Amino acid sequence: VVPFEQNREIRFSEETREDIIRACFAMGKVKTGALIVVEQAIRLTEYESTGIQMDCLVSSQVLINIFEHNTPLHDGAIIVRGDRIVSATCYLPLSDNMGISKDLGTRHRAAVGMSEVSDALVITVSEETGAVSVAQGGELTRSINEAELRVKLEEVQHKSSETNRIKAMWKGWRKHAKKNN
């Protein structure tokens, strides 16, 4: 990474957005589980380092290939930064939120957990049902359709990084304040 690019606002292209959508719903049709973390303002370096480092343009074919059963990279999450997949097989923090439905597994708990500690948008594809869900800000929106996923990704795509940083700091402060009360 070039030092002067560190603070550059990184957003993904429409092509990346559409490839993510296409891959998620293709995997859903054949019930291939997936966990895709779309990084925003907060760098996910700590979680990125738990996986296998990659530097690959996002494409629906690559995403589908990564999560294919019995392949070396299918377990864990991938992290997307801008238009690139930067890491695969990443471990994410699990949510300890007791309000999460008991019928949801580790993948969904990890999605919510990651969204509790960062400003990332986390997309899951259920291996059991094929349903696509999104976690953001500690909330899980289950069984969304292609249009709804497109709206969520467009919101992320067009947010300013300064707004994201302020919201993340506020959320972190609130969570810390709740634990100390």
Residue map of PLM features:
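Divalent-cation
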Residues: 1-181
